[in-house]
Amino acid sequence: MERLQRLMMNTKVGAADANKDDTKETVYISSIALLKMLKHGRAGVPMEVMGLMLGEFVDEYTVNVVDVFAMPQSGTGVSVEAVDDVFQARMMDMLKQTGRDQMVVGWYHSHPGFGCWLSSVDVNTQKSFEQLNNRAVAVVVDPIQSVKGKVVIDAFRLIDTGALINNQEPRQTTSNSGLMNKANIQALIHGLNRHYYSLNIDYHKTPAETKMLLNLHKEQWQSGLKMQDYQEKETENLEATKRMVAVAQQYSKRIEEEKELSEEELKTRYVGKQDPKKHLAKTAENTLEENTVSVLTAGVNSIAIK
C-alpha cells in the first residue's frame, strides 16, 4: 500500500513538472525586430515607449519573435490601460495584408538608462498579457546603455503565485542553458526570481540579414574621394606638429636621463609609461599618411572637375 502511494505521489509530481516552464526556454529575436525596438526606444528618450511583438510559439522551449510594431503610447510608466485595443486590431489587420500573419507573443518597452527589470506597473501589464496567453513574454530594452556590439535587453515572465505558496520551483531544469547568464543585481532588487523570472535570449539571422548587416557600415570606393575641409585639415596638422615638437623635446630629455641609468633600470624604464620614441614615430606616420591621401584626393577631384 505504501509503495502504491509513493508511485501515485511520483506521478503527481511528474505531471506537475510536465506543465511547468523550462529553464531552457529561449526567446529568439530576429534582426529586424531588434533594430526596430532599439530605434523606437532611442526615439522616445527620455520617456518610456512600448510596442507589441509578433511571432509564434514553436514548441515548449522556443519562442520566435519575427517582427514588432510600436504602440502610440509613452510615459514614465506603461499601464494596462495604455494598450490601445483598437489600434492593435487595425495594425494586425494591415499586417495580415502584407503577409505578416503571426500572432502576438508578448510586448516590449524601454527603460532608458536604468536597466532591465519590471516595475509593479509592468508586472500588472504582464498579468493582462498572460491572461490571454500564459506564455506571453515581456521584453525590456535599455537604449541608453546599449552600445555597438552590446545590447542591454532582457525577457521576463511572471512566476505563478501557486508555486510560491506551495514552496515549489517556478520552472523545471532539464539543462544548463538557463543557468549560463548571471542575474543583474538591479533586477534582483526589483523582484527578479521573486515575482518574475528571466528568459534566455538569442538572435536569429537569416543569410540575407547577415549580408545586410555586414554591409551596413561598409565603406564604398567613393569614400576615399571625399574631401576634408582645408581649414579643419590645417588645424589638425598644426596640432599634430605641436604634439610632435613636445614629444621630441621629451624624447631628447629622456635620452640625457638614460645615460645615467644602468642596464637593469633601462629594461623597466617605460613599463606602464608612454614611450616618446614610439609615440613620435606613430604620430609622424599618421600625419604623413593623412596628408598624402588628402593631396591625392584633391588632385583626383581637380581633374574630375575639369
Swiss-Prot record:
Binding positions for Zn(2+) per the UniProt entry: 109, 111, 122
GO biological process assignments: mitochondrial fission; peroxisome fission; proteasome assembly; proteasome storage granule assembly; proteasome-mediated ubiquitin-dependent protein catabolic process; protein deubiquitination
Protease keyword on record: yes
Pfam families named in the record: JAB, RPN11_C
GO molecular function: metal ion binding; metal-dependent deubiquitinase activity
Residue span(s) of domain MPN: 27-162
Locus of motif JAMM motif: 109-122
Keywords: Hydrolase, Metal-binding, Metalloprotease, Protease, Proteasome, Zinc
Similarity field: Belongs to the peptidase M67A family.
Function description: Acts as a regulatory subunit of the 26 proteasome which is involved in the ATP-dependent degradation of ubiquitinated proteins.
Listed name of the protein: 26S proteasome regulatory subunit RPN11
Encoding gene (name): RPN11
